[in-house]
Amino acid sequence: MNEKLSTPSNITIERKLNHVEICLHGNVSFEGTTTGLERYAIEHQAVPEINYADINLSATLLGRTIGAPLMISSMTGGYHEAATLNRQFAQAAEHFRIPLGVGSMRQALENNEHRESFAVVRKAAPSVPVFANIGAPEVAAGLESSQIETMLDLIQADGLIVHLNAAQELFQPEGNTNFHGFLDQLASLTAKTPVPVIAKEVGSGISAEAARLLIDAGVKVIDVAGAGGTSWQKVEEVRYIKRFGNENRFSPEALNELLNWGIPTATCLEEIGRLKKNHPQYQPIEIIASGGIQSGIDVAKTILLGASVAASAGRLLKALHEGKLLQTIEMWLNDLKAVMFLTGSLSLEQLQKKRMTLKHLPT
């Protein structure tokens, strides 16, 4: 097994536990950087000419019909407590017939003991798309075919997410910042993986140029995971300070900008939308919009900006912690349905053709 995956598994477990606790209780949202979705206003249709009861929220992703254009994004796994979280997320995904991504499966490759925390997902969500997940540093180091098979078989995965987390690794106390050779290894991975590969940022966004490189390496779906939601730099900075104290790694003048580093979600969608429009070979690529999604109106705006589905992690984690996961998803779908009614859209295909205008926001 490669050097990266030989890291003691108890360190990985501690990190994953820290991540959930910090995301639930810490102040780790972007400051001064928003998703950019608030800049848009969806045009009202005073004469909708439809029956609200006839509105259909169903969508497609990778050829699969799903109940709505929403995905429960990758969060956690690989330790005992994660089994309960993942089971509940999977039950919600099955209830609403929406896709689900698991957290990084590196731990499943390091230690057989905690594989059940991932396996529970497919048991609880037998009929919806479920996606495996591994990090870019692990891909750059080289994954064996047997390791890929282990991840996919464990959850009977419909796709493999490769998460791109350079900014997170930079701030992580035990981070791996060696991304050299990643694109070549990604091309090798996509060639030998029997399911589609999804490239996903974790909160700093994917530009059109990065999307082009990823697509050319064989990626079929881009999850932009733009800035405006959870800053994983802030999550890791909390862990760093707890371990080493308030030791200065970066100049005070730069630290705030680095903690809030990233491309807003809306900007990512705009850029990749232009890439697809101007280059026919990229048009089949599907887009997942995540990074700061807070409501069904945000979901609607991402659909109008070219996404196939929107996805959320942090907001839904908090909803689960509050015992309101199903209620929150239900409200978001009601939000989306309201927008569709007020734009005269019976389907998502019709919604995609509606207009948005840029608001004049105060400076």
Swiss-Prot record:
Pfam families: FMN_dh. This is Isopentenyl-diphosphate delta-isomerase. Its cofactor is FMN; NADPH; Mg(2+). CDD domains: IDI-2_FMN. One of its GO terms (cellular component) is cytoplasm. Belongs to the IPP isomerase type 2 family. The lineage of its organism: Bacteria, Pseudomonadati, Chlorobiota, Chlorobiia, Chlorobiales. Substrate binds at R15, K16, S104, M105, R106, Q168. GO terms for biological process: isoprenoid biosynthetic process. Keywords: Cytoplasm, Flavoprotein, FMN, Isomerase, Isoprene biosynthesis, Magnesium, Metal-binding, NADP. Disulfide bonds: none annotated. It catalyses: isopentenyl diphosphate = dimethylallyl diphosphate. It is found in: Cytoplasm. Homooctamer. Dimer of tetramers. The keyword Magnesium applies. Mg(2+) binds at E169. FMN binds at S73, S74, M75, T76, S104, N133, K200, T230, A313, G314. Involved in the biosynthesis of isoprenoids. Catalyzes the 1,3-allylic rearrangement of the homoallylic substrate isopentenyl (IPP) to its allylic isomer, dimethylallyl diphosphate (DMAPP). It comes from Chlorobium phaeobacteroides (strain DSM 266 / SMG 266 / 2430). One of its GO terms (molecular function) is NADPH binding.
